[in-house]
């Protein structure tokens, strides 16, 4: 249907806006789409709407950049023209460029989020913001050294069998309470 995609990584202020999106989503959504369709994610875009302090705007840029996109796009020129965020971002982008020249591909705990699944709203992103390096994927990460399974992972009927094979092969798994509750009747 489409040749490529571009990812909106705006998270705004998670406390005062209606979206309540954790900031780590700026990173995890990029890695999710890159893992879904490698090489076809053109980049990440973010805006300055509902970012009441400069740090909120800059954090969207940092987290998007750390996902190693092909490019960053600053959305909505009219809202950025003559705005205090732009000089601050320019200053930080120079530093990010120097840092990212030495960074490799994003790695971390593989969080299995199958397509079209509902679960614990963004729990992986909250875990990311407290320091767990979470990288999201729509495919069961059987080769990953460590995985995170949430209620969203439980929407796949054979996920418990996949988990059993993974752990039997010496993989390390972290599961959430939501995953356990959703799979109790499947032998977890």
Protein language model features and the residues they cover:
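Helical hinge/lid and interdomain linker segments adjacent to catalytic or ligand-binding clefts
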Residues: 114-186
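Hydrophobic targeting/anchoring helices
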Residues: 1-133
């Amino acid at each position: 249907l489409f040749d490529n995609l571009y990812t909106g990584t705006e998270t705004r202020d998670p406390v005062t806006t209606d979206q309540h999106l954790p900031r780590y989503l700026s990173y995890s959504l990029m890695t999710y789409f890159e893992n879904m369709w490698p090489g076809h994610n053109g980049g990440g875009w973010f805006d300055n709407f509902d970012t009441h302090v400069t740090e909120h705007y800059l954090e969207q840029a940092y987290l998007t950049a750390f996902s190693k996109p092909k490019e960053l796009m600053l959305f909505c020129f009219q809202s950025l023209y003559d705005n205090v965020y732009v000089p601050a971002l320019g200053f930080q982008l120079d530093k990010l460029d120097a840092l990212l020249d030495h960074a490799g591909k994003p790695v971390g705990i593989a969080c299995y989020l199958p397509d079209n699944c509902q679960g614990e709203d963004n729990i992986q992103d909250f875990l990311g913001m407290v320091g767990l390096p979470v990288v999201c994927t729509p495919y069961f990460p059987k080769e990953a050294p460590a995985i995170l399974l949430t209620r969203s992972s439980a929407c796949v009927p054979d996920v418990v069998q996949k988990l059993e094979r993974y752990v039997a092969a010496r993989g390390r798994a972290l599961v959430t309470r939501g995953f356990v509750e959703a799979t109790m009747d499947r032998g977890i």
